[in-house]
Amino acid sequence: MEARAGRACLGGAGAACRLQPWGVGGCRPVVGAHQVGNALLALAAVQALGVDLAEAAPRLNTLKPVPGRMNVIARDRGTLVDDTYNANPGSVRAAIAWLAGRPSPRTLVLGAMGELGPSAETLVTELGANARAAGIDTLITLPGAEAAARGFGDGAEPVEHFDQAAERAAGTLARGGTVLVKGSRSARMEQVVQRLTDKGRGH
């Protein structure tokens, strides 16, 4: 059976769509166009097991975002997105595509990605260029992701420490913008999220 999203609405709080051929609506309270595909796969599996989709689809509303996986954290003025659980070129491109749909200013904070092999520098440079082409306003890179800064060009801010990254990104949040933080688990990019969260609480 072919399953597709007939109408999709991708907002800052989640992804809503009408699912074809079933004609039922569903919403996942997690962000990103790729989440619509994940919802389709889940419902196709449920349908194959004989479960009533009119009952199953609304259950998508109860999904709780996993920390570190496009988890939206509202700040007083801006929006912080914790996508630090892991990273590869494909997931970074998906994150960039979502961030590009947000109002300016938009800042991507990118850490190192592991296991990219001999093409690592080329792949990471291309991600920086991709962020530039998508209209991302600022790219902040941590050690291991410096090649992305070179690919991005003007507006890239390579830094050495988590504190520096958080300090630069805080300006975007103060102006009501969106900051998305991403990197491999080994890059410990959740440290940037924690610092930005603490700043928002006035610590």
Predicted regions span which residues?
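Extended acidic/charged loop-beta regions that coordinate divalent cations
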Residues: M1-V24, P67
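ATP-dependent carboxylate-amine ligase
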Residues: P29-H34, L40-H203
